[in-house]
Amino acid sequence: MQKVFNMHDLVKFSPETLKYNEAGLVPCIAQDVESGEILMMAWMNAESVAKTLETGRVTYWSRSRQSFWIKGESSGHVQELVELRVDCDRDALLAMVRQTGPACHTNRRSCFYTAIRDGEEHEIMTPIS
């Protein structure tokens, strides 16, 4: 039988309740809320999770720059947060977003543009012109 939730079942969310890796990061998958397409994966720390929830603009942690990365801040290809979901182990996030323009830095709609078929790589998506 399916459990029915009521207002008393709601729990206040805190980024500190997530399980971060040894670098203090958690993976976050971005998914287009309208098409269901998987757009990208990037990392978040507790502060970037909090910033994302506060601003509604998806904010990642750049491991290479060691700084916050507000998606689309320089390119204009923003990700507007619709809903943030936590997986069952609390060690991964799913950001349901409205994506403006391409999500990938290669100018493709998705970062997942290479398929492996019969042991060979196939480019299945071209850059947006």
From Swiss-Prot:
Ranges annotated as spanning the membrane: none
UniProt keyword annotation of Metal-binding present: yes
InterPro entries referenced in this protein's UniProt entry, alphabetically: PRA-CH, PRib_AMP_CycHydrolase_dom, PRib_AMP_CycHydrolase_sf
Necessary cofactors: Mg(2+); Zn(2+)
Compartments it resides in: Cytoplasm
GO molecular function: magnesium ion binding; phosphoribosyl-AMP cyclohydrolase activity; zinc ion binding
Binding site for Zn(2+): C88, C104, C111
One GO cellular component term: cytoplasm
UniProt EC number: 3.5.4.19
Main localization (coarse): cytoplasm
Binding residues for Mg(2+): D87, D89, D91
UniProt-listed GO biological process terms: L-histidine biosynthetic process
Reactions the enzyme catalyzes: 1-(5-phospho-beta-D-ribosyl)-5'-AMP + H2O = 1-(5-phospho-beta-D-ribosyl)-5-[(5-phospho-beta-D-ribosylamino)methylideneamino]imidazole-4-carboxamide
Function: Catalyzes the hydrolysis of the adenine ring of phosphoribosyl-AMP.
Family, as annotated: Belongs to the PRA-CH family.
Protein name in the entry: Phosphoribosyl-AMP cyclohydrolase
Protein source organism: Ruegeria sp. (strain TM1040) (Silicibacter sp.)
Organism lineage string: Bacteria, Pseudomonadati, Pseudomonadota, Alphaproteobacteria, Rhodobacterales
The encoding gene: hisI
